[in-house]
C-alpha cells in the first residue's frame, strides 16, 4: 500500500479493539535516495525519539489506565512508522484489557519492531512521573537581523562558512516544515553541534527558514539538514537534534550524529513540548 491509497490524511474511524495492522510503515530509502544516502552505508548514527502522551488501556478489572510512552527507532531501521498510524494504533488499546504494564510494553515494542524491521526500545511512564523542563543548549541565532525570501524547497546553497575552524553549538526555534501526509505544520527547535569550518550564523538561519513550506517527514528534514551541513563544511564532528512540538498527542525528535558512540540528548522537555 502507498501513501496515496492509504487511510492517512483522510477522515479516520478510531477502533476500540487492539489492531496492529493500523501501523503504516514507510521505507526510509524512498526519502534517502534524494539525499544520496544508502541504508547500508549511512553517513550518520542516531535514533528517532518518539513521545506518545495519550496511551490508555484497561486493567484486569476493567479500570482505565493512562501513561506516557517513549520509544526509540534506530536510524538503521529500514522503515519508519507514520505518526498518524501510530496514534490510531495506540488508541486501539483504549478498551483493551491488559494484564500488566510490562505486557503492554512488550506488545507495543514488538509491533513497532516488526514494522520498522529493527529493534525498537522504549519505556512506559506513569502519568505522575516528574518531568523536568529545560531550554536549548548553545548559542541561539534567532535574533540575527536578516531578510528572508525563500521558504521552500530547502536551499542548501544558502549555507555559508568562514575559513576558520571552530567547535560550537547553535540552536534555533524557527524551524518549521509541513507533514508530508496531512500538510499540517511541524514546529521544531533544532540544536546543531559541530567541529569544523565556522558556519555563518546569518546564512544558517536563512537556510533553516527555507524549510518553512517544505512537505517532508520529520526524519527526512533532520537527515536533509545533516547532509547539507556535512556536505558544506565537511566537519570533523556533527550532530543534529530536532525537538518537534507534539501533534495528535505525539512528538518526534530525530537525532543524527557522526559519532558512533553518541549519547542521547537531554530528556528535559522544552517549553513548547
From Swiss-Prot:
Keywords: Cytoplasm, NADP, Oxidoreductase, Queuosine biosynthesis. Pathway: tRNA modification; tRNA-queuosine biosynthesis. The active site is at 179 (thioimide intermediate), 186 (proton donor). Transmembrane segments: none annotated. InterPro entries: GTP-CH-I_C/QueF (IPR043133), NADPH_dep_7-cyano-7-deazaG_red (IPR050084), QueF (IPR029500), QueF_N (IPR029139), QueF_type2 (IPR016428). GO terms for biological process: queuosine biosynthetic process; tRNA modification. Its EC number is 1.7.1.13. Substrate binds at residues 81-83, 218-219. PANTHER family: NADPH-DEPENDENT 7-CYANO-7-DEAZAGUANINE REDUCTASE. Catalyzes the NADPH-dependent reduction of 7-cyano-7-deazaguanine (preQ0) to 7-aminomethyl-7-deazaguanine (preQ1). This is NADPH-dependent 7-cyano-7-deazaguanine reductase. It comes from Rickettsia bellii (strain OSU 85-389).
Amino acid at each position: 500500500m502507498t501513501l496515496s491509497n492509504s487511510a492517512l490524511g483522510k477522515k479516520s474511524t478510531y477502533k476500540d479493539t487492539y489492531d496492529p495492522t493500523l501501523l503504516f510503515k514507510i521505507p526510509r530509502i524512498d526519502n534517502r535516495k534524494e539525499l544520496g544516502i544508502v541504508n547500508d552505508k549511512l553517513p550518520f548514527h542516531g535514533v528517532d525519539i518518539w513521545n506518545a502522551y495519550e496511551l490508555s488501556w484497561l486493567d484486569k478489572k476493567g479500570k482505565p489506565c493512562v501513561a506516557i510512552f517513549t520509544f526509540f527507532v534506530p536510524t538503521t531501521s529500514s522503515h519508519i512508522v507514520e505518526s498518524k498510524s501510530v496514534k490510531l494504533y495506540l488508541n486501539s488499546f483504549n478498551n483493551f484489557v491488559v494484564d500488566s504494564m510490562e505486557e503492554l510494553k512488550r506488545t507495543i515494542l514488538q509491533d513497532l519492531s516488526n514494522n520498522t524491521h529493527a529493534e525498537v526500545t522504549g519505556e512506559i511512564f506513569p502519568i505522575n512521573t516528574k518531568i523536568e523542563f529545560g531550554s536549548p543548549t548553545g548559542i541561539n541565532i534567532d535574533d540575527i537581523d536578516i531578510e528572508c525570501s525563500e521558504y521552500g524547497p530547502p536551499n542548501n546553497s544558502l549555507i555559508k562558512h568562514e575559513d576558520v575552524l571552530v567547535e560550537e553549538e547553535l540552536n534555533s526555534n524557527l524551524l518549521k516544515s509541513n507533514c508530508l501526509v496531512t500538510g499540517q505544520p511541524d514546529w521544531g527547535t533544532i540544536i546543531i553541534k559541530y567541529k569544523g569550518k565556522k558556519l555563518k550564523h546569518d546564512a544558517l538561519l536563512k537556510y533553516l527558514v527555507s524549510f518553512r513550506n517544505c512537505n517532508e517527514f520529520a526524519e527526512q528534514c533532520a537527515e536533509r539538514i545533516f547532509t547539507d551541513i556535512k556536505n558544506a563544511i565537511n566537519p570533523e564532528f556533527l550532530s543534529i537534534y530536532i525537538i518537534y512540538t507534539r501533534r495528535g498527542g505525539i512528538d518526534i525528535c530525530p537525532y543524527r550524529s557522526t559519532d558512533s558512540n553518541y549519547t542521547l540528548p537531554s530528556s528535559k522537555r522544552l517549553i513548547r513540548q
